[in-house]
Amino acid sequence: QKKEKNYSELTFHYWFWQNKLSSYDNKTWIGFCQKRRFWLKKKVKIKSFEDLKKNILKEQPKKWNKYESVICNPVSVHSPKKMKLLKRGWKNLIKDPSIFYDLKKQNIKLHFDMHHGYGILDRAAEVMDKKEKEEFKKYINDNNKFNPNIMYVSKKIFLQKWFTDLFNWLFKC
């Protein structure tokens, strides 16, 4: 409970994992959306609650049967506005001024440092197992795209692994 304020949407995911996930069979598709972001049958502008009811995804499309999980399209975090970089990324700039103009260094780690706190992601990575830590650090330093919003649809068997790994990691942080 003391960490709840830091978990945001994950508070519900934790509750679901602890209280509901076990009631589903391993092949059942389970999906999570986010406030004002929903899984839709097709790309369409939602203008009313009626539009949402008509277009919200209620069962997985057949083409998903060849997948284990489905996640949102990635978003790019490179090329932050220069003023934002100066205001929020100044610690990163002091450490490495080339971040200001080198797009390869405008990565996920920089984005996280700017928006969630400098060094927090590095400290969180330190409590990971060695192999995962190395892969994670490489990913956040080498990439400028990630899949946002904690939105995904997956079968129970994969959600169980995801939640176990995720919350074990978060409890160590």
Predicted segments with their positions:
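ER/Golgi luminal nucleotide-sugar-dependent glycosyltransferases, focusing on the catalytic module
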Residues: 1-173
